[in-house]
C-alpha cells in the first residue's frame, strides 16, 4: 500500500525510492 500523492484531478500513487515519484493510477 503506497501513499497516495495529493494531485488533482487524477489520483496518483507515490512511489518511495525514486525521489517520491508520482505515478498515475488508472
Swiss-Prot record:
Disulfide bond listed as a keyword: yes
Concerning PTM, the database record says: Glycosylated. High-mannose type oligosaccharides.
Q: Does the keyword Glycoprotein apply?
A: yes
Q: Which domain of life is it from?
A: Eukaryota
Question: What quaternary arrangement does the UniProt entry report?
Answer: Disulfide-linked dimer of A and B chains.
Residue ranges crossing the lipid bilayer per the database entry: none
Q: What else is known?
A: Cytotoxic activity repressed by addition of Gal and its derivatives. Melibiose preferentially protects normal cells from apoptosis as compared with transformed cells. The inhibitory concentration 50% (IC50) is 0.8 ng/ml for transformed cells and 10 ng/ml for normal cells.
Q: What is this protein called?
A: Aralin B chain
Protein species of origin: Aralia elata
Task: Provide this UniProt record's keywords sorted from A to Z.
Answer: Apoptosis, Disulfide bond, Glycoprotein, Toxin
**What GO molecular function annotation could you give as one example from this UniProt entry?**
toxin activity
Protein task: Lectin specific for galactose (Gal) and its derivatives. Induces apoptosis. Has cytotoxic activity against several human cancer cell lines. Is less cytotoxic to normal human cells.
Amino acid at each position: 500500500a503506497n501513499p497516495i500523492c495529493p494531485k488533482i484531478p487524477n489520483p496518483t500513487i507515490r512511489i518511495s525510492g525514486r525521489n517520491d515519484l508520482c505515478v498515475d493510477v488508472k
